[in-house]
Swiss-Prot record:
UniProt keywords, alphabetically: Cell membrane, Membrane, Transmembrane, Transmembrane helix, Transport
Record organism: Rickettsia prowazekii (strain Madrid E)
InterPro entries per the UniProt record, alphabetical: AI-2E-like
Protein name according to UniProt: Putative transport protein RP630
Annotated GO CC locations: plasma membrane
TM ranges: 6-26, 28-48, 60-80, 148-168, 217-237, 239-259, 260-280, 304-324
């Protein structure tokens, strides 16, 4: 092993060890850095359109962000917190309704066609429902512990706007200094890979965040207009669960349908819920995603499914939410690794 490899091995070991020791301290800095990264396009847009300095553009975006941040914590958070508390109290009622009212008629029709398949579907659905409600029950049982954690997060978030101000102000200088630390010989190649990752992340994360916010607004307003219980909570949940391909919308639709039945009974408003989801799904699939994100991720559906299960198995719920960008980054790294391998003497030399 050469001296360069030893140096980087020791450096990475010390860096990771040090990072793990100060994880709690570094959290607000990490979050502020991510927010600053997400806000950069808005800063560049303001800077070019108004023809002002980068620092002035950063100050304008910072004030806008701070205003939105303040409104969310003073208006939306108390409402959402109250609706979460109501939802947790009603979890047993939702489960009983699903198992006694929704599934029996469906399973009865399947039994009349194919009893063997119906038994398998029944057991699979039962296991799936029990898993979902076990998770929800666990959250309910630990609600007050999560409340204490929420208070700690609130205190943590008080620091974020302060740290964010300095990140926004000195962003270009920070990035330049970070680039200067890269090895001179391999710097162009590393920057090329980082640029590809940045393009992917900026396309997906910023695009997906915009889609989630638009859908959350749409569903929250639509649910409020038809008068369903927990309208704001269900709207935000539905809007952000689209991050999970395939399963996200189905889970939120099923939950909304149950709460809709408990709110209205068997009425035409259940049909309204279906229409709201149909419009939302069409809008997300055929308008928002193609226009905002497009095909820039370039992942095959099978690779997406594999990524969801793999990341979910390794990192839990958080892993599922970040499965697609992780898969995209992995794809970029693998393509570059294959390119390096094909340009190596090992690949080109005949054995």
């Amino acid at each position: 092993m050469n001296r360069t490899a030893v140096f980087w091995l020791v450096f990475l070991t010390l860096f990771i060890s040090g990072f793990m020791l100060i994880t709690d301290t570094i959290k607000p800095f990490f979050i502020a850095f991510i927010i600053s990264y997400l806000l950069q396009p808005a800063i560049y847009f303001i800077e070019s359109k108004l023809e002002i300095s980068n620092k002035l553009a950063s100050s304008i975006i910072y004030l806008i962000f701070l205003s939105i941040f303040f409104l969310i914590f003073t208006i939306l958070i108390p409402i959402i917190y109250g609706q979460i508390f109501t939802f947790i109290n009603n979890i047993p009622k939702y489960k009983n309704y699903l198992q006694s009212e929704i599934l029996p008629p469906i399973m009865g029709k399947i039994y009349s066609i194919e009893p063997d398949i119906a038994d398998k579907i029944k057991h699979s659905l039962s296991d799936f429902i029990n898993s979902i409600f076990t998770i929800l029950g666990s959250i309910a049982n630990n609600f007050w512990r999560y409340t204490i954690i929420t208070i700690n997060i609130f205190v943590l978030f008080l620091l974020i706007p302060i740290i964010l101000f300095y990140f926004l102000r000195d962003w270009d200088k920070i990035i330049t200094n970070m680039e200067s630390l890269l090895p001179i010989k391999t710097r162009p190649k590393i920057l090329e890979i980082l640029s590809a990752i940045n393009n992917l992340l900026s396309s997906y994360i910023r695009g997906q965040l915009n889609i989630c916010l638009l859908l959350s607004t749409y569903y929250s307003i639509a649910f409020t207009l038809i008068g369903i219980d927990l309208a704001l909570l269900l709207g935000i949940l539905t809007g952000f669960l689209v991050i999970i391909p395939l399963l996200g919308t189905f889970i939120s639709f099923l939950l909304t349908l149950i709460i809709g039945y408990l709110t209205f009974g068997i009425t035409s408003k259940l049909l309204y819920i279906m229409i709201i989801y149909l419009i939302g799904n069409i809008g997300e699939s055929y308008i928002l995603t193609p226009k905002i994100i497009g095909d820039k991720i370039g992942l095959h559906p099978l690779w997406i499914i594999f990524a969801i299960f793999a990341c979910g198995s390794l990192f839990g719920i958080i892993g599922i939410f970040f499965a697609i960008p992780i898969a995209g980054i992995t794809k970029i790294l693998l393509l570059n690794l294959i390119k390096f391998y094909k340009s190596s003497k090992f690949y080109r030399t005949d054995v």
